[in-house]
A protein has these predicted regions:
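N-terminal accessory alpha/beta regions
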Residues: 63-192, 290, 296-297, 304-306
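Bacterial Sec-dependent N-terminal signal peptides
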Residues: 25-45
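N-terminal secretory signal peptides that target proteins for export/translocation
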Residues: 1-11
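Bacterial N-terminal signal peptides
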Residues: 15-28
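Active-site substrate-binding loop specific to GH73 endo-beta-N-acetylglucosaminidase modules
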Residues: 122-129, 162-415, 419-472, 642-645
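Substrate-binding/catalytic groove segments of enzymes
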Residues: 66, 158, 246-252, 286, ...
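Cell-wall polysaccharide-cleaving catalytic domain and substrate-binding groove, primarily
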Residues: 46-98, 208-209, 216-223, 240, ...
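Flexible, low-complexity segments enriched for small/polar residues
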Residues: 45-46, 53-60, 76-77, 113, ...
Length: 645
């Protein structure tokens, strides 16, 4: 079964491409397309290029001809798996590109101090993200950080996250301006892209942006006479979204059931209450203040304030007899059957901090963590419906990287990207008479809808882009290459702007239509098939995307206003413009666009429709610009390009 945005035949006029998109589902694998070859050596080269493009479309923000050629060359030399593993090692060895630093660089290049207040500086946060996604060398780290940001979600709707304020924290020091806090959170995710899950969970918990977003900041211990109890928000979400999910899972992704056939919850309301007691006493970092109610400081991890941390006595003290303890009241905290260590009296900051870390140890050790987290990572990086075998192989690496280490993110990312299932969405068949590589797609269980941001970044990166921005990145000397937050109005997705802690879309979302109720094969661990990215594809958003994409293809640039001036990113397609002078070169142009944008999945039917439509409208060499623009628009709007195999 194959979810496709079924495209009616394109109608091409002199400057307009109209493609009507209808959400639909086919029920079988289909021929994606063919790549002609002159000899066996070309067959090998073509296969390597397609495999390289397919891998890079998942591991980066989009392949380029240069990155395809580089990886394909190594595939020819040492084989697919070794070449890709080598590439991963090289990527994680690169210095991390910092969102915070790039944002500071852009605002400084614009002639302002990074800590200047009152200039709407939060807009630079988005500009920095796009510049890094489009140009950074450490593509894999940034792509994994993007995936992690959709699991450990914060959003700019958080209180003060867009403020231009900074404040003194004693000893002559000041906080960073509030708007940079989200950039530091994203950098933290990027650092842990090749780190350890348990350490990531700790840094997420102590980060002030997460503390503010999910109410752990200033969360106070209970006061029974006053009717006050700890806020349960972070306790609930760290379990539901950041670690174990709602229901118990087998390591191959299947949901466990009890004797009555019912799903087995991973936690209950009492578990939330118990864990909420742990996440008390958090305040923002201050050098000298003794107050629990210190103001925002998004540049340093939160601190523990022991006086407001649940000390296992505040539930037991008799309010009518201070100091008298009810012996039947709980004297400890128990999580998942594990009783946390006793707390000293008086309680110290160090002991309260240690209790938080002990609780995180308990959470991270749960059996549900590997399948829950690995499934989300696979969905964000590779495919919507990983098989049971795929899940088993990846969760095995999560549990033990081969050296006795649990939660090694480097090993997990390798297991995800090097798994044979990554390339099983396409079969590359050698055919003769004539000699060619025929690409056959396997259908829904091996695919996913490309999310809007990936469609934009992949498109731009493939077009040999140049920027006309008036200032340059000090690391490269090249102009900053940026989009702005305004693009959200065109594609319904924007970094740092998830509508809620549940991300842009749910992992178990099923779009209306044939997919609902369609039984998957036995290789799939769930009873249904899911397509998360379809949740942001509505009739309205699809229409906006068509209009915007067709316009970009027609003008061959993308431009948005920045905080200062505007940035135009131009497509360098001079080679293809020269080819487009002759209609006979249209197959070669489509071959290039197919490799760059579709990883070889552009069907022969789509190619034929595009060629027929273009040749019926234009024949002279002077119409080469029109031909190229129409070909580009038709490819980028095709269902073959929208669906990643």
């Amino acid at each position: 079964m194959h979810p496709k945005l079924l495209a009616r035949p394109a109608i091409l006029t002199k400057s307009v491409v109209v493609v009507a998109l209808v959400i639909g589902f086919g029920l079988q694998a289909c021929d994606a397309g063919t790549f002609p070859a002159a000899n066996s050596r070309e067959i090998k080269a073509i296969r390597s290029q397609i495999r390289a493009s397919q891998f890079l479309s998942k591991a980066t923000f989009g392949p380029t001809q240069e990155t395809i050629d580089s990886l394909a060359g190594r595939i020819n030399q040492i084989g697919y798996r070794r070449a890709c593993e080598e590439w991963i090692d090289e990527q994680f060895a690169l210095p991390m590109t910092s969102q915070e630093q790039v944002a500071r660089d852009i605002i400084a290049a614009d002639g302002r101090e990074p800590d200047t207040q009152g200039v709407g500086a939060s807009l630079y946060r988005y500009q920095a993200w796009w510049h890094i996604a489009l140009t950074s060398e450490d593509q894999l780290r940034q792509k994994v950080a993007w995936a992690l940001s959709q699991i450990f979600v914060i959003s700019d709707s958080g209180a003060a996250f867009n403020n231009d304020d900074k404040r003194a924290i004693g000893n002559g020091e000041f906080t960073i301006t509030d708007w940079l806090g989200m950039s530091t959170f994203y950098d933290m995710l990027a650092r842990h892209a090749s780190g350890n899950y348990r350490e990531l969970l700790s840094d997420v918990t102590w980060h002030p942006n997460m503390g503010v977003y999910l109410s752990a900041w200033r969360n106070r211990k209970s006061n029974i006479p006053a009717g006050r109890y700890p806020d349960e928000n972070y306790a609930r979400e760290i379990m539901q979204l950041f670690s174990i999910g709602l229901y118990q899972m087998h390591q191959d992704g299947r949901l466990k059931r009890n004797a009555l056939g019912e799903l087995i919850p991973t936690y209950d309301n009492e578990g939330i209450k118990e864990l909420a007691r742990v996440f008390t006493g958090f305040r923002t970092h201050h050098n000298t203040s003794s107050s629990f109610f210190t103001n925002y400081n998004f540049g340093s991890p939160m601190q523990m304030y022991a006086q407001e941390h649940d000390n296992n006595l505040n539930y037991a003290e008799d309010p009518n007899n201070p100091g008298q303890v009810d012996p039947s009241a709980p004297q400890s905290k128990t999580l998942f059957g594990v009783t946390l260590s006793p707390l000293p009296t008086p309680l110290t900051n160090e002991a309260a901090t240690a209790e938080v870390e002990e609780a995180l140890d308990v959470i991270a050790s749960q059996d549900n963590v590997p399948p829950f987290i690995c499934r989300l990572l696979i969905q964000r990086l590779v495919k919507s419906n990983p098989s049971r075998a795929y899940m088993r192989r990846v969760t095995r690496k999560f549990r033990d990287n081969g050296h006795g280490v649990r939660g090694d993110m480097n090993a997990v990312i390798k297991a995800i990207l090097l798994d044979p299932e990554v390339v099983r969405g396409q079969r590359l068949m050698r055919r003769t008479n004539p000699l060619r590589v025929e690409v056959v797609t396997r259908g829904t269980e091996h695919s996913r809808l490309r999310e809007p941001i990936q469609r934009i970044t992949s498109w731009i990166r493939a077009m040999r882009p140049t920027s006309n921005y008036y200032t340059s990145d000090p690391r490269t000397g090249k102009p900053f290459m940026m989009l702005s937050h305004s693009i959200q109005g065109d594609i319904d997705q924007m970094p740092y702007r998830a509508p809620s802690v549940f991300n842009y879309y749910l992992p178990d979302y099923q779009p209306p239509g044939d997919l609902v109720g369609h039984p998957p094969s036995s290789r799939i661990p769930r009873e249904g098939l899911f397509a998360p990215e379809f949740q942001v594809l509505t009739a309205v958003s699809a229409n906006r995307t068509i209009n915007r994409f067709s316009y970009i293809a027609r003008v061959r640039y993308i431009q948005y206003g920045m905080r200062k001036n505007s940035c135009r990113i131009s497509f360098n397609l001079d080679e293809e413009l020269e080819l487009a002078k002759d209609n006979a070169n249209l197959p070669e142009i489509l071959r290039r666009f197919d490799l760059w944008l579709c990883s070889g999945s552009l069907s022969e039917q789509t190619k034929t429709s595009i060629i027929n439509a273009i040749t019926s409208e234009s024949t002279s060499a002077s119409q080469n610009v029109l031909r190229l623009e129409e070909a580009l628009a038709a490819v980028i709007l095709s269902p073959d390009c929208a669906i990643e195999e």
